[in-house]
Amino acid sequence: MINQDSIVALATPSGAGAIAVIRISGAEAVSIGNSVFKSIKNKDLTKQKTHTLHLGHIVDNGKTLDEVLVSVFKGPNSYTGEDTIEISCHGSTYIQQQIIQLLLRKGCRMADAGEFTLRAFLNGKLDLSQAEAVADLISSDNEASHHIAMQQMRGGFSNEIAKLREELLNFASLIELELDFAEEDVEFADRTQFHELLNRIEFVLKRLIDSFAVGNVIKNGIPVAIVGEPNVGKSTLLNALLNEERAIVSDIAGTTRDTIEDELVIGGIGFRFIDTAGIRETKDVVESIGIKKTFEKIDQAQVVIYLFDGLKFKASSSEFVSEIEQIKNKYPLKPLLIVVNKKDILSEDEVLNITQKLENLNAKLLLISAKQKIGVEELKNELLSFVNTGALRNNETIVTNTRHYDSLLKALDEIQKVKFGLETNLSSDLIALDIKEALYQFGLITGQVSNDELLGNIFANFCIGK
Protein backbone atom coordinates (compact mmCIF):
# COMPACT_ATOMS: atom_id res chain seq x y z
CA MET A 1 0.00 0.00 0.00
CA ILE A 2 3.02 2.31 0.44
CA ASN A 3 3.34 4.63 -2.53
CA GLN A 4 6.82 5.12 -3.92
CA ASP A 5 6.12 8.61 -5.23
CA SER A 6 7.21 11.75 -3.41
CA ILE A 7 4.56 13.94 -1.83
CA VAL A 8 4.56 17.63 -0.96
CA ALA A 9 2.35 19.84 1.21
CA LEU A 10 2.41 22.92 3.36
CA ALA A 11 3.16 21.78 6.93
CA THR A 12 2.25 25.10 8.56
CA PRO A 13 -1.24 26.67 8.63
CA SER A 14 -2.35 28.18 5.34
CA GLY A 15 -2.20 31.94 4.98
CA ALA A 16 0.49 34.58 5.35
CA GLY A 17 2.89 34.53 8.28
CA ALA A 18 6.49 35.14 9.28
CA ILE A 19 7.60 31.76 7.91
CA ALA A 20 6.06 28.73 6.24
CA VAL A 21 7.31 25.14 6.12
CA ILE A 22 6.90 23.01 3.01
CA ARG A 23 7.39 19.29 3.54
CA ILE A 24 8.46 16.69 0.95
CA SER A 25 8.64 12.94 1.64
CA GLY A 26 9.44 9.97 -0.56
CA ALA A 27 12.21 8.10 -2.31
CA GLU A 28 13.06 11.10 -4.52
CA ALA A 29 12.40 13.82 -1.93
CA VAL A 30 16.03 14.85 -1.44
CA SER A 31 16.94 14.75 -5.13
CA ILE A 32 13.84 16.77 -6.06
CA GLY A 33 14.65 19.29 -3.35
CA ASN A 34 18.24 19.44 -4.54
CA SER A 35 17.09 20.22 -8.09
CA VAL A 36 15.49 23.51 -6.99
CA PHE A 37 17.84 24.46 -4.14
CA LYS A 38 21.06 26.41 -4.51
CA SER A 39 23.16 26.25 -1.35
CA ILE A 40 25.19 29.33 -0.43
CA LYS A 41 28.09 26.90 0.11
CA ASN A 42 27.36 24.97 -3.12
CA LYS A 43 26.42 21.82 -1.20
CA ASP A 44 24.67 18.89 -2.87
CA LEU A 45 21.71 17.90 -0.65
CA THR A 46 21.86 14.28 -1.80
CA LYS A 47 25.33 13.97 -0.26
CA GLN A 48 24.49 15.54 3.09
CA LYS A 49 24.03 13.69 6.36
CA THR A 50 20.62 13.25 7.94
CA HIS A 51 19.30 15.86 10.36
CA THR A 52 21.26 18.74 8.85
CA LEU A 53 20.29 22.33 7.98
CA HIS A 54 21.31 24.21 4.85
CA LEU A 55 20.93 27.88 3.94
CA GLY A 56 20.37 28.85 0.34
CA HIS A 57 17.83 29.85 -2.29
CA ILE A 58 14.98 28.23 -4.20
CA VAL A 59 15.63 28.88 -7.88
CA ASP A 60 13.24 28.41 -10.81
CA ASN A 61 14.92 28.62 -14.24
CA GLY A 62 17.53 31.03 -12.92
CA LYS A 63 14.98 33.13 -11.02
CA THR A 64 15.37 33.24 -7.24
CA LEU A 65 12.03 32.71 -5.53
CA ASP A 66 13.17 33.01 -1.91
CA GLU A 67 16.00 32.61 0.57
CA VAL A 68 15.26 29.46 2.56
CA LEU A 69 16.53 27.04 5.18
CA VAL A 70 16.32 23.38 4.15
CA SER A 71 16.23 20.53 6.70
CA VAL A 72 17.34 17.09 5.49
CA PHE A 73 16.09 13.89 7.15
CA LYS A 74 17.21 10.57 5.69
CA GLY A 75 14.99 7.51 6.07
CA PRO A 76 14.40 5.51 8.14
CA ASN A 77 15.38 8.16 10.69
CA SER A 78 12.60 10.59 9.81
CA TYR A 79 8.99 11.17 10.81
CA THR A 80 7.64 9.20 7.84
CA GLY A 81 10.47 6.67 7.75
CA GLU A 82 11.30 7.94 4.24
CA ASP A 83 13.74 10.52 2.94
CA THR A 84 12.22 13.87 3.88
CA ILE A 85 13.12 17.51 3.44
CA GLU A 86 11.46 20.56 4.93
CA ILE A 87 11.82 23.95 3.29
CA SER A 88 11.44 26.89 5.66
CA CYS A 89 10.59 29.90 3.53
CA HIS A 90 9.13 33.34 4.10
CA GLY A 91 5.41 33.16 4.85
CA SER A 92 4.04 34.99 1.81
CA THR A 93 1.20 32.98 0.27
CA TYR A 94 2.63 33.83 -3.16
CA ILE A 95 6.05 32.39 -2.23
CA GLN A 96 4.46 29.28 -0.73
CA GLN A 97 2.44 28.55 -3.85
CA GLN A 98 5.32 29.29 -6.23
CA ILE A 99 7.61 26.83 -4.41
CA ILE A 100 4.92 24.13 -4.21
CA GLN A 101 4.05 24.53 -7.91
CA LEU A 102 7.76 24.26 -8.77
CA LEU A 103 8.11 21.05 -6.74
CA LEU A 104 5.04 19.59 -8.45
CA ARG A 105 6.61 20.27 -11.85
CA LYS A 106 9.79 18.55 -10.66
CA GLY A 107 7.96 15.30 -9.87
CA CYS A 108 6.16 15.63 -6.54
CA ARG A 109 2.42 15.24 -6.13
CA MET A 110 0.20 16.93 -3.56
CA ALA A 111 -0.15 14.89 -0.39
CA ASP A 112 -3.54 13.59 0.65
CA ALA A 113 -4.94 14.46 4.08
CA GLY A 114 -2.81 12.81 6.76
CA GLU A 115 -0.60 11.07 4.22
CA PHE A 116 2.67 11.90 5.97
CA THR A 117 1.41 10.26 9.17
CA LEU A 118 -0.12 7.40 7.16
CA ARG A 119 3.33 6.71 5.71
CA ALA A 120 4.80 6.85 9.22
CA PHE A 121 2.29 4.17 10.25
CA LEU A 122 2.87 2.00 7.18
CA ASN A 123 6.63 2.26 7.67
CA GLY A 124 6.38 1.17 11.31
CA LYS A 125 7.28 4.51 12.87
CA LEU A 126 3.95 4.70 14.72
CA ASP A 127 1.17 2.26 15.44
CA LEU A 128 -2.39 3.27 14.61
CA SER A 129 -3.36 4.57 18.04
CA GLN A 130 -0.18 6.68 18.16
CA ALA A 131 -0.96 8.05 14.71
CA GLU A 132 -4.45 9.05 15.88
CA ALA A 133 -2.86 10.74 18.90
CA VAL A 134 -0.94 13.01 16.51
CA ALA A 135 -4.26 14.46 15.32
CA ASP A 136 -5.44 14.80 18.93
CA LEU A 137 -2.22 16.60 19.87
CA ILE A 138 -2.63 19.08 17.01
CA SER A 139 -6.21 19.83 18.06
CA SER A 140 -5.54 19.93 21.83
CA ASP A 141 -6.43 23.29 23.35
CA ASN A 142 -5.91 22.74 27.08
CA GLU A 143 -3.41 21.11 29.43
CA ALA A 144 -5.46 17.96 30.04
CA SER A 145 -6.14 17.11 26.39
CA HIS A 146 -2.48 17.87 25.57
CA HIS A 147 -1.30 15.57 28.38
CA ILE A 148 -3.50 12.69 27.22
CA ALA A 149 -2.50 13.08 23.57
CA MET A 150 1.21 13.19 24.44
CA GLN A 151 0.92 10.09 26.61
CA GLN A 152 -0.84 8.19 23.81
CA MET A 153 1.56 9.42 21.13
CA ARG A 154 4.50 8.18 23.22
CA GLY A 155 2.92 4.73 23.28
CA GLY A 156 1.35 4.58 26.75
CA PHE A 157 -1.99 3.23 25.52
CA SER A 158 -0.39 1.10 22.78
CA ASN A 159 1.99 -0.56 25.23
CA GLU A 160 -0.87 -1.44 27.56
CA ILE A 161 -2.88 -3.02 24.73
CA ALA A 162 0.20 -4.76 23.31
CA LYS A 163 0.95 -6.35 26.69
CA LEU A 164 -2.61 -7.68 27.00
CA ARG A 165 -2.51 -8.98 23.44
CA GLU A 166 0.84 -10.73 23.92
CA GLU A 167 -0.24 -12.49 27.12
CA LEU A 168 -3.51 -13.60 25.56
CA LEU A 169 -1.74 -14.70 22.39
CA ASN A 170 0.60 -16.94 24.39
CA PHE A 171 -2.33 -18.79 25.91
CA ALA A 172 -4.14 -18.86 22.58
CA SER A 173 -1.14 -20.68 21.11
CA LEU A 174 -1.40 -23.33 23.83
CA ILE A 175 -5.14 -23.71 23.20
CA GLU A 176 -4.46 -24.15 19.47
CA LEU A 177 -1.83 -26.75 20.35
CA GLU A 178 -4.43 -28.68 22.32
CA LEU A 179 -6.63 -28.74 19.23
CA ASP A 180 -3.77 -30.26 17.23
CA PHE A 181 -3.52 -33.04 19.83
CA ALA A 182 -7.25 -33.42 20.45
CA GLU A 183 -7.05 -37.21 20.26
CA GLU A 184 -4.40 -37.26 23.00
CA ASP A 185 -6.76 -35.51 25.46
CA VAL A 186 -3.99 -33.35 26.97
CA GLU A 187 -4.03 -29.79 28.33
CA PHE A 188 -1.10 -27.52 27.52
CA ALA A 189 -2.76 -24.38 28.93
CA ASP A 190 -3.00 -24.33 32.71
CA ARG A 191 -6.68 -23.46 33.31
CA THR A 192 -6.04 -21.82 36.68
CA GLN A 193 -3.34 -19.53 35.29
CA PHE A 194 -5.50 -18.84 32.25
CA HIS A 195 -8.42 -17.81 34.45
CA GLU A 196 -6.16 -15.49 36.45
CA LEU A 197 -4.94 -13.92 33.21
CA LEU A 198 -8.50 -13.39 32.01
CA ASN A 199 -9.36 -11.69 35.31
CA ARG A 200 -6.39 -9.33 34.89
CA ILE A 201 -7.33 -8.54 31.30
CA GLU A 202 -10.95 -7.96 32.30
CA PHE A 203 -9.85 -5.59 35.08
CA VAL A 204 -7.64 -3.54 32.74
CA LEU A 205 -10.30 -3.40 30.02
CA LYS A 206 -12.94 -2.20 32.49
CA ARG A 207 -10.58 0.50 33.77
CA LEU A 208 -9.83 1.70 30.23
CA ILE A 209 -13.53 1.64 29.31
CA ASP A 210 -14.45 3.60 32.45
CA SER A 211 -11.75 6.18 31.66
CA PHE A 212 -13.56 7.08 28.43
CA ALA A 213 -16.24 8.91 30.42
CA VAL A 214 -13.53 11.33 31.58
CA GLY A 215 -11.40 11.25 28.45
CA ASN A 216 -14.22 12.00 26.04
CA VAL A 217 -15.38 15.13 27.86
CA ILE A 218 -11.79 16.32 28.39
CA LYS A 219 -11.13 15.96 24.69
CA ASN A 220 -14.32 17.74 23.63
CA GLY A 221 -14.80 20.10 26.59
CA ILE A 222 -17.06 19.54 29.60
CA PRO A 223 -20.49 21.07 28.90
CA VAL A 224 -21.96 23.14 31.75
CA ALA A 225 -25.53 24.43 31.45
CA ILE A 226 -26.32 27.71 33.26
CA VAL A 227 -30.09 27.67 33.81
CA GLY A 228 -32.67 29.51 35.87
CA GLU A 229 -35.32 32.22 35.67
CA PRO A 230 -34.85 34.89 32.99
CA ASN A 231 -32.89 38.01 33.92
CA VAL A 232 -31.19 36.68 37.06
CA GLY A 233 -27.68 37.32 35.79
CA LYS A 234 -26.86 34.22 33.76
CA SER A 235 -25.34 36.26 30.95
CA THR A 236 -23.46 38.43 33.45
CA LEU A 237 -22.11 35.31 35.17
CA LEU A 238 -21.05 33.85 31.84
CA ASN A 239 -19.24 37.08 31.00
CA ALA A 240 -17.57 37.07 34.44
CA LEU A 241 -16.39 33.49 33.93
CA LEU A 242 -15.10 34.28 30.45
CA ASN A 243 -13.82 37.78 31.29
CA GLU A 244 -15.47 39.19 28.18
CA GLU A 245 -18.80 40.51 26.92
CA ARG A 246 -20.21 37.44 25.20
CA ALA A 247 -23.94 37.43 25.96
CA ILE A 248 -26.52 40.22 25.66
CA VAL A 249 -26.95 41.80 29.09
CA SER A 250 -30.14 43.80 29.66
CA ASP A 251 -32.79 44.50 32.29
CA ILE A 252 -35.58 43.03 30.14
CA ALA A 253 -36.65 39.55 31.23
CA GLY A 254 -36.10 36.89 28.59
CA THR A 255 -33.43 38.81 26.67
CA THR A 256 -31.29 35.69 26.14
CA ARG A 257 -33.52 34.21 23.45
CA ASP A 258 -31.18 31.38 22.47
CA THR A 259 -28.46 29.26 23.99
CA ILE A 260 -25.00 30.83 23.99
CA GLU A 261 -21.83 28.75 24.27
CA ASP A 262 -18.25 29.63 25.03
CA GLU A 263 -15.19 27.85 26.35
CA LEU A 264 -12.95 28.35 29.35
CA VAL A 265 -9.97 26.39 30.67
CA ILE A 266 -10.00 25.83 34.42
CA GLY A 267 -7.10 23.97 36.01
CA GLY A 268 -6.04 22.63 32.63
CA ILE A 269 -9.54 21.25 31.88
CA GLY A 270 -11.71 22.67 29.10
CA PHE A 271 -15.29 23.64 29.98
CA ARG A 272 -18.05 24.67 27.56
CA PHE A 273 -20.43 27.06 29.28
CA ILE A 274 -23.94 27.20 27.89
CA ASP A 275 -26.11 30.18 28.82
CA THR A 276 -29.77 29.39 28.23
CA ALA A 277 -33.11 31.15 28.01
CA GLY A 278 -34.41 30.15 31.47
CA ILE A 279 -37.22 27.78 32.41
CA ARG A 280 -40.12 29.94 33.60
CA GLU A 281 -43.60 29.31 32.25
CA THR A 282 -44.43 31.73 29.44
CA LYS A 283 -46.95 32.39 26.68
CA ASP A 284 -44.34 34.09 24.51
CA VAL A 285 -43.76 31.80 21.51
CA VAL A 286 -40.16 32.86 20.89
CA GLU A 287 -39.21 32.52 24.55
CA SER A 288 -40.95 29.12 24.74
CA ILE A 289 -38.65 27.86 22.00
CA GLY A 290 -35.68 29.04 24.07
CA ILE A 291 -36.99 27.19 27.15
CA LYS A 292 -37.33 24.00 25.12
CA LYS A 293 -33.71 24.43 24.05
CA THR A 294 -32.75 24.88 27.71
CA PHE A 295 -33.88 21.35 28.53
CA GLU A 296 -32.15 20.04 25.41
CA LYS A 297 -28.92 21.62 26.64
CA ILE A 298 -29.37 20.19 30.14
CA ASP A 299 -29.68 16.76 28.48
CA GLN A 300 -26.25 17.31 26.89
CA ALA A 301 -24.56 18.90 29.92
CA GLN A 302 -22.28 17.12 32.37
CA VAL A 303 -22.88 19.74 35.08
CA VAL A 304 -25.85 22.04 35.74
CA ILE A 305 -25.70 25.46 37.39
CA TYR A 306 -29.07 26.72 38.63
CA LEU A 307 -28.79 30.48 39.16
CA PHE A 308 -31.33 32.75 40.84
CA ASP A 309 -31.58 36.33 42.11
CA GLY A 310 -31.11 36.32 45.89
CA LEU A 311 -33.22 39.48 46.27
CA LYS A 312 -36.24 37.66 44.82
CA PHE A 313 -35.93 34.55 46.96
CA LYS A 314 -38.23 35.68 49.79
CA ALA A 315 -41.13 36.34 47.42
CA SER A 316 -40.49 33.40 45.06
CA SER A 317 -38.81 30.76 47.23
CA SER A 318 -41.45 28.10 46.54
CA GLU A 319 -41.07 28.59 42.77
CA PHE A 320 -37.27 28.37 42.97
CA VAL A 321 -37.39 25.24 45.14
CA SER A 322 -39.93 23.67 42.78
CA GLU A 323 -37.74 24.34 39.73
CA ILE A 324 -34.61 23.01 41.45
CA GLU A 325 -36.48 19.85 42.45
CA GLN A 326 -37.77 19.54 38.88
CA ILE A 327 -34.19 19.56 37.57
CA LYS A 328 -33.00 17.13 40.26
CA ASN A 329 -35.87 14.72 39.60
CA LYS A 330 -35.42 14.81 35.84
CA TYR A 331 -31.61 14.56 36.01
CA PRO A 332 -30.83 12.77 39.31
CA LEU A 333 -27.30 11.75 38.28
CA LYS A 334 -26.12 15.14 37.00
CA PRO A 335 -24.04 17.26 39.39
CA LEU A 336 -26.06 20.36 40.32
CA LEU A 337 -24.73 23.64 41.69
CA ILE A 338 -27.26 26.07 43.18
CA VAL A 339 -25.81 29.55 42.74
CA VAL A 340 -27.36 32.60 44.43
CA ASN A 341 -26.58 35.88 42.66
CA LYS A 342 -26.25 39.42 44.12
CA LYS A 343 -24.45 38.35 47.27
CA ASP A 344 -22.95 41.84 47.52
CA ILE A 345 -26.36 43.42 48.30
CA LEU A 346 -27.96 40.64 50.37
CA SER A 347 -28.46 41.15 54.11
CA GLU A 348 -27.34 38.56 56.66
CA ASP A 349 -30.99 37.65 57.34
CA GLU A 350 -31.62 37.10 53.62
CA VAL A 351 -28.55 34.87 53.33
CA LEU A 352 -29.64 32.87 56.40
CA ASN A 353 -33.17 32.44 55.01
CA ILE A 354 -31.81 31.16 51.68
CA THR A 355 -29.39 28.66 53.22
CA GLN A 356 -31.97 27.28 55.66
CA LYS A 357 -34.59 26.67 52.97
CA LEU A 358 -32.18 25.10 50.47
CA GLU A 359 -29.96 23.00 52.73
CA ASN A 360 -32.16 19.91 52.36
CA LEU A 361 -32.00 19.84 48.55
CA ASN A 362 -28.77 17.81 48.58
CA ALA A 363 -26.91 20.14 46.22
CA LYS A 364 -23.90 22.41 46.61
CA LEU A 365 -24.94 26.01 47.41
CA LEU A 366 -22.78 29.02 46.50
CA LEU A 367 -23.44 32.73 46.95
CA ILE A 368 -21.85 35.02 44.39
CA SER A 369 -22.05 38.42 42.76
CA ALA A 370 -21.77 37.98 39.01
CA LYS A 371 -21.56 41.74 38.49
CA GLN A 372 -18.81 42.27 41.09
CA LYS A 373 -17.20 38.87 40.33
CA ILE A 374 -17.44 37.85 43.98
CA GLY A 375 -17.31 34.06 44.42
CA VAL A 376 -16.47 33.40 40.76
CA GLU A 377 -13.16 31.69 41.60
CA GLU A 378 -14.90 29.50 44.19
CA LEU A 379 -17.42 28.53 41.51
CA LYS A 380 -14.58 27.57 39.16
CA ASN A 381 -13.05 25.37 41.87
CA GLU A 382 -16.39 23.65 42.47
CA LEU A 383 -16.73 22.92 38.76
CA LEU A 384 -13.26 21.43 38.72
CA SER A 385 -14.13 19.18 41.67
CA PHE A 386 -16.80 17.45 39.56
CA VAL A 387 -14.18 16.21 37.11
CA ASN A 388 -12.43 12.97 38.02
CA THR A 389 -8.86 14.17 37.51
CA GLY A 390 -7.37 11.38 39.63
CA ALA A 391 -6.42 9.39 36.54
CA LEU A 392 -4.66 12.46 35.15
CA ARG A 393 -2.76 13.09 38.38
CA ASN A 394 -1.74 9.43 38.59
CA ASN A 395 -0.62 9.47 34.94
CA GLU A 396 -2.97 6.59 34.13
CA THR A 397 -3.99 5.76 30.58
CA ILE A 398 -7.18 7.59 29.58
CA VAL A 399 -9.17 6.62 26.49
CA THR A 400 -10.51 9.52 24.40
CA ASN A 401 -11.05 7.86 21.02
CA THR A 402 -14.52 6.49 20.20
CA ARG A 403 -13.04 3.85 17.88
CA HIS A 404 -10.79 2.55 20.65
CA TYR A 405 -13.70 2.60 23.11
CA ASP A 406 -15.82 0.50 20.75
CA SER A 407 -13.06 -2.10 20.30
CA LEU A 408 -12.44 -2.24 24.05
CA LEU A 409 -16.13 -2.95 24.68
CA LYS A 410 -16.10 -5.74 22.10
CA ALA A 411 -12.85 -7.18 23.47
CA LEU A 412 -14.30 -7.19 27.00
CA ASP A 413 -17.37 -9.04 25.75
CA GLU A 414 -15.16 -11.71 24.14
CA ILE A 415 -12.99 -12.07 27.26
CA GLN A 416 -16.11 -12.61 29.36
CA LYS A 417 -17.26 -15.26 26.88
CA VAL A 418 -13.89 -17.02 27.26
CA LYS A 419 -14.23 -16.91 31.06
CA PHE A 420 -17.71 -18.40 30.82
CA GLY A 421 -16.39 -21.09 28.50
CA LEU A 422 -13.69 -22.06 30.98
CA GLU A 423 -16.13 -22.12 33.90
CA THR A 424 -18.60 -24.33 31.99
CA ASN A 425 -15.92 -26.61 30.47
CA LEU A 426 -16.71 -25.50 26.94
CA SER A 427 -14.66 -27.22 24.23
CA SER A 428 -11.27 -25.71 23.38
CA ASP A 429 -12.23 -25.01 19.76
CA LEU A 430 -15.13 -22.75 20.83
CA ILE A 431 -12.97 -20.99 23.41
CA ALA A 432 -10.33 -20.45 20.72
CA LEU A 433 -12.87 -18.63 18.52
CA ASP A 434 -13.66 -16.10 21.27
CA ILE A 435 -9.95 -15.60 21.98
CA LYS A 436 -9.31 -14.87 18.30
CA GLU A 437 -12.06 -12.24 18.26
CA ALA A 438 -10.59 -10.54 21.35
CA LEU A 439 -7.14 -10.55 19.71
CA TYR A 440 -8.73 -9.10 16.57
CA GLN A 441 -10.18 -6.17 18.54
CA PHE A 442 -6.79 -5.50 20.17
CA GLY A 443 -5.23 -5.54 16.71
CA LEU A 444 -7.77 -3.04 15.39
CA ILE A 445 -6.71 -0.55 18.07
CA THR A 446 -2.99 -0.68 17.29
CA GLY A 447 -3.31 -1.29 13.55
CA GLN A 448 -1.95 -4.83 13.56
CA VAL A 449 -5.29 -5.58 11.94
CA SER A 450 -6.42 -2.93 9.45
CA ASN A 451 -7.86 -2.34 6.01
CA ASP A 452 -7.82 0.44 3.44
CA GLU A 453 -11.30 1.70 4.38
CA LEU A 454 -10.41 1.96 8.07
CA LEU A 455 -7.14 3.77 7.36
CA GLY A 456 -8.87 6.08 4.87
CA ASN A 457 -11.47 7.10 7.44
CA ILE A 458 -8.87 7.77 10.12
CA PHE A 459 -6.35 9.75 8.10
CA ALA A 460 -8.98 11.75 6.19
CA ASN A 461 -9.46 13.74 9.40
CA PHE A 462 -5.84 14.95 9.41
CA CYS A 463 -4.65 18.22 7.92
CA ILE A 464 -2.96 17.93 4.51
CA GLY A 465 0.59 18.65 5.71
CA LYS A 466 0.52 16.07 8.51
From Swiss-Prot:
It is an enzyme of class 3 (hydrolase). (6S)-5-formyl-5,6,7,8-tetrahydrofolate binds at R23, E86, K125, K466. InterPro entries: G_TrmE (IPR031168), GTP-bd (IPR006073), GTP-bd_TrmE_N (IPR018948), GTPase_MnmE (IPR004520), MnmE_dom2 (IPR027368), MnmE_helical (IPR025867), P-loop_NTPase (IPR027417), Small_GTP-bd (IPR005225). Its cofactor is K(+). GO terms for molecular function: GTP binding; GTPase activity; metal ion binding. The gene is mnmE. Exhibits a very high intrinsic GTPase hydrolysis rate. Involved in the addition of a carboxymethylaminomethyl (cmnm) group at the wobble position (U34) of certain tRNAs, forming tRNA-cmnm(5)s(2)U34. GTP binds at residues 231-236, 250-256, 275-278. GO terms for biological process: tRNA methylation; tRNA wobble uridine modification. Belongs to the TRAFAC class TrmE-Era-EngA-EngB-Septin-like GTPase superfamily. TrmE GTPase family. Homodimer. Heterotetramer of two MnmE and two MnmG subunits. Coiled coil: none annotated. It is found in: Cytoplasm. Keywords: Cytoplasm, GTP-binding, Hydrolase, Magnesium, Metal-binding, Nucleotide-binding, Potassium, tRNA processing. Mg(2+) binds at S235, T256. PANTHER family: TRNA MODIFICATION GTPASE GTPBP3, TRNA MODIFICATION GTPASE GTPBP3, MITOCHONDRIAL. Residues 221-388 form the TrmE-type G domain. CDD domains: trmE, TrmE_N. The keyword Ion transport does not apply. It comes from Flavobacterium johnsoniae (strain ATCC 17061 / DSM 2064 / JCM 8514 / BCRC 14874 / CCUG 350202 / NBRC 14942 / NCIMB 11054 / UW101). The keyword Flavoprotein does not apply. One of its GO terms (cellular component) is cytosol. Its EC number is 3.6.-.-. This is tRNA modification GTPase MnmE.
